[in-house]
Amino acid sequence: MSASSIARTVYIVSDSTGITAETFSQSVLSQFDQVDFKPIRLPFIDTLQKAEETAERINKNAADTGVPPIVFSTLVNPEILARVRQANGVFLDLFGTFVSHIEQALGLKSSPSIGRSHMQADSEKYRNRIDAINFSLAHDDGQFVNQLDQADVILVGVSRCGKTPTSLYLAMQYAIKAANFPLTPDDFERSSLPKTIAPYRDKLFGLSIQPERLSEVRNERRPNSRYATIEQCRYEVAEAERMMRRAGISWLSTTTKSIEEIATTVLQEVGLGR
């Protein structure tokens, strides 16, 4: 962000966790890279007293900065919604904007419910998500390999290319049982996939990364080590990509991609659309 960038406060207001509004706001605000947005999440605004306090906070920010803050809302209760809407902010009602149009299209009235977009702790979907998270944690970095046949996908690549965060994101967001397995210099010397994962060729998806970026990441973990040198990184990346091409494994570079983009590509390429 440049020194001359514009600063603007953003309030993310919800009567539940605020995750939906936060995710939407990040996507929208990312289109304005000349603005230094200051996001503040206000979850569980589920009483009129909390709504009043939220409105006062928004008004104070507007008075202090001289500009009304941007307010993203997924409030459901009409009274709470009305009170926060009265505050001096640029108010964006995410549910109201879309629900009314869908009501017209369907010829039906919606049945508002707080937190409905998120899973209940006793639901089957929630339990599947927890099972997937536990699976991904147990099968991180090739630690446990006895149940790889149960994996939905096995991510492969050199150390520190983004396998672990992608595996956990797939588990948490999509209940995907994602294992990950490292490709090491020993594997490159043998010029073949590790025997542990070779039987699961149809489950494999590769992640790569630019050597320069890999060196930066590894230096944060092991400064001044051979493991982090640009020469070692170039060697490992080149050999890993050669191995994946030879084995016919689809892969992508994680260098400039977010975890969300990587995960979406994995889902599409492996045929795990959710």
UniProtKB/Swiss-Prot annotation:
Keyword entries, A-Z: Kinase, Nucleotide-binding, Serine/threonine-protein kinase, Transferase
Record keyword Kinase present: yes
NCBIfam families assigned: PRK05339.1
Organism: Bordetella avium (strain 197N)
Keyword Kinase listed: yes
Protein name (database record): Putative phosphoenolpyruvate synthase regulatory protein
Enzyme Commission number(s): 2.7.11.33, 2.7.4.28
Coiled-coil regions listed: none
